[in-house]
C-alpha cells in the first residue's frame, strides 16, 4: 500500500490489514510510507502493517539528511530485507554509510518539527487556493495524512506559472525557469520545481505535475513556514494574477 497523498489513511490501513489477514493469515502487509511520517499520532506498523519503508530526503530526514532510506517493522522481515539488499550473512552489520550518520540522526531528531512546518504550509496553500476558486485535496479543514496538496490548475499556463513561482522563491537556483520535459514512466511531459539544498528533496518546498488535462499540480514540503508562505504566495500570483 502507498500512503502518499492520502492513498491509504491510517484507518484504512487497519481495515485492509484485517481483511487481508482474514483471507490469508500468512500475508505480509507492506506500506510505502513516503510523505506520511509524523503527520499522525500513529505510524502504519501501529495500524496493522508488517513492514514500512520511506525516504530520508522526505519527512524523516528533516531536510538535513542528504540521502538514504529506512526499513522498519517486524524484526524477521527487516533482517530478510537487510540480507537481500546487502549480502547474506552480513545483513545490517556491515555496509556503506557515506559519512552521513550524523546528518541522518540530526535530521531524524528535527523531523517532527519540520513536518509540522510543512503541514502549516499545506494548510496555508489550501486556504489560498480556495480563495482563487480551486479545490485542493485535502482541504485546509480536513485531516492531513501526509504533506502533499494537489489541485487542478485547469490550464497548462497556470500549472507552469505555479511551478515557476515556487522555483523563483526557492533558496537554490531561484533564477531557473522550469520547463516541461519528457520523464521516464510518464506518457506526457512533466514540469517540476525544486530549488532545494538536497537534490530531489520533497520535504523542502517543491511541486510538479504532468502537462495533461486537468493539469493537476502536486505541492509538498516546506522546511519553515515563513519562507514557504512566500513561495506559495508567489506561485499563486504567478499562476493566476500575472496580468
Task: Give residue ranges: language-model regions.
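Conserved active-site segment immediately N-terminal to the catalytic lysine
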Residues: 44-60
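Single conserved hydrophobic/aromatic residue that forms the stacking wall/gate
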Residues: 1-9
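General beta-strand structural signal in soluble alpha/beta enzymes
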Residues: 29-33, 51-55, 138, 174-178
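Short, solvent-exposed amphipathic alpha-helical segments in soluble enzyme
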Residues: 45-46, 70, 86-87, 164-171
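Conserved C-terminal alpha-helix-loop-beta "cap" of PLP-dependent enzymes
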Residues: 130-242
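Active-site C-terminal subdomain of aminotransferase-like
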Residues: 57-158, 235-243
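Catalytic PLP-binding core of fold-type I/II PLP enzymes
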Residues: 10-42
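Secondary-structure boundary elements
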Residues: 18-28, 45-50, 75-80, 87, ...
Amino acid at each position: 500500500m502507498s500512503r502518499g497523498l492520502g492513498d491509504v489513511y491510517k484507518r484504512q490501513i487497519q481495515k485492509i490489514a484485517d481483511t487481508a489477514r482474514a483471507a490469508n493469515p500468512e500475508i505480509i502487509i507492506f506500506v510505502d510510507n513516503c510523505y506520511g511520517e509524523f503527520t499522525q499520532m500513529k505510524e502504519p506498523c501501529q495500524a496493522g502493517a508488517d513492514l514500512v519503508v520511506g525516504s530520508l530526503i522526505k519527512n524523516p530526514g528533516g531536510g538535513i539528511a542528504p540521502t538514504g532510506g529506512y526499513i522498519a517493522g517486524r524484526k524477521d522481515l527487516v533482517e530478510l530485507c537487510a540480507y537481500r539488499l546487502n549480502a547474506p550473512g552480513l545483513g545490517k552489520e556491515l555496509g556503506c554509510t557515506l559519512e552521513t550518520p550524523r546528518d541522518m540522526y540530526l535530521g531524524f531528531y528535527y523531523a517532527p518539527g519540520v513536518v509540522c512546518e510543512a503541514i502549516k504550509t499545506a494548510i496555508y496553500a489550501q486556504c489560498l487556493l480556495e480563495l482563487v476558486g480551486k479545490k485542493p485535496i485535502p482541504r485546509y479543514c480536513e485531516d492531513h495524512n501526509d504533506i502533499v496538496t494537489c489541485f487542478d490548475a485547469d490550464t497548462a499556463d497556470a500549472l507552469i506559472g505555479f511551478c515557476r513561482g515556487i522555483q523563483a522563491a526557492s533558496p537554490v537556483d531561484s533564477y531557473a525557469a522550469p520547463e516541461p520535459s519528457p520523464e521516464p514512466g510518464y506518457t506526457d511531459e512533466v514540469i517540476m520545481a525544486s530549488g532545494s539544498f538536497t537534490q530531489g528533496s520533497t520535504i523542502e518546498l517543491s511541486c510538479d505535475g504532468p502537462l495533461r488535462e486537468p493539469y493537476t499540480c502536486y505541492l509538498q514540503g516546506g522546511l519553515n513556514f515563513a519562507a514557504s508562505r512566500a513561495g506559495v504566495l508567489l506561485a499563486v500570483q504567478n499562476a493566476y494574477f500575472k496580468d
